[in-house]
């Protein structure tokens, strides 16, 4: 269209409104906003306990590599809603493209197993396949570290995840990027604002080192905003206070409305 306008004395339109539209699409895409989906880790384990009879690492690994999908029946309301959420994610991605939903956040992540539980449910819903002939990962998985104890275990959780060859394959299918969300509110309620900020700072450095060890790009998602106790304050000051190397070309932050 632009070439046609330029060839037919339409420079004002081609270099004006049309050019601005093209630049906007290049920058932001055609999707209004990419959504994140978030669920508590215990909900995933509850669903898997009903379907598989457990959610240990051995059970999850076996199910992740199974070609067949177990029959999901007689689920309680919360487990049924959880699985329907994954099915809805697949439907939206298939209809509108991969930009509509990119990240699935697991709140109250205490171990790598909490993330793998969500991965297995995603596999059941058709969002993940690790079969060599047709491997794909339509969404990425984001551990949310909220309490001081989880922040102090951040490096161990991420290292265990990335050391799992099946999970690492998912990361590679997603462009070699691992996102981790850091919670400001719960850690502040746990130990106060000073300890919370210091533990978040240390967690970022440890996560950075683990990402370098495994040769993946780290994208930190800061769940900050609102009051000072929830990490609020000027964004510029927050950015320049981040540890060296923790921004690997990408960063995410919540913006309170």
What role is predicted for each listed range?
Residues 1-4, 8, 21-24, 28, ...:
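Generic, well-ordered alpha-helical scaffold segments in large soluble proteins
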Residues 1-95:
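Extended, charge-enriched "interface" segments that sit outside catalytic cores
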Residues 27, 105, 220-222:
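A structural signal for short, well-ordered beta-strand segments and their strand-loop junctions
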Residues 125-257:
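Catalytic or ion-translocation cores adjacent to nucleophile or general acid/base/metal-coordination motifs
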Residues 16-19, 80, 84, 113-116, ...:
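Generic alpha-helical secondary structure signal
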Residues 8-11, 75-79, 104, 108-111, ...:
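Hydrophobic alpha-helical scaffolding
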Residues 58-63, 68-119, 128-142:
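C-terminal amphipathic alpha-helical interaction region
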Residues 14, 33-36, 42-45, 114-116, ...:
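Short helix/loop capping segments that flank catalytic or ligand/cofactor-binding pockets
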């Amino acid at each position: 269209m632009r070439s046609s306008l330029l060839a037919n004395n339409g420079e004002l339109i081609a270099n004006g409104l049309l050019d601005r539209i093209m630049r906007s699409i290049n920058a932001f895409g055609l999707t209004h906003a990419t959504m994140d989906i978030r669920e508590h880790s215990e909900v995933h384990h509850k669903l898997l306990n009903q379907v598989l009879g457990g959610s240990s690492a051995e059970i999850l690994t076996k199910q992740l590599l199974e070609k067949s999908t177990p029959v999901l029946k007689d689920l309680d309301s919360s487990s049924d809603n959880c699985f329907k959420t994954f099915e809805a994610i697949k439907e939206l991605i298939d209809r509108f493209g991969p930009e509509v939903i990119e990240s699935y956040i697991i709140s109250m992540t205490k171990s790598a197993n909490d993330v793998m539980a969500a991965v297995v449910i995603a596999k059941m819903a058709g969002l993940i396949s690790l079969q060599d002939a047709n491997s794909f990962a339509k969404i990425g998985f984001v551990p949310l570290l909220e309490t001081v104890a989880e922040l102090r275990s951040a490096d161990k959780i991420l290292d265990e995840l990335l050391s799992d060859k099946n999970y690492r394959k998912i990361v590679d299918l997603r462009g070699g990027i691992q996102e981790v969300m850091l919670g400001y509110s719960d850690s502040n309620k746990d130990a106060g604002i000073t300890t919370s900020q210091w533990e978040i700072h240390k967690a970022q450095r440890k996560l950075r080192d683990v990402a370098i060890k495994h040769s993946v790009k780290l994208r930190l998602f800061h769940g900050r905003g609102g009051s000072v106790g929830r990490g609020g304050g000027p964004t510029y000051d927050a950015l320049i206070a981040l540890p060296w190397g923790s921004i690997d070309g990408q960063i995410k932050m919540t913006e309170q409305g």
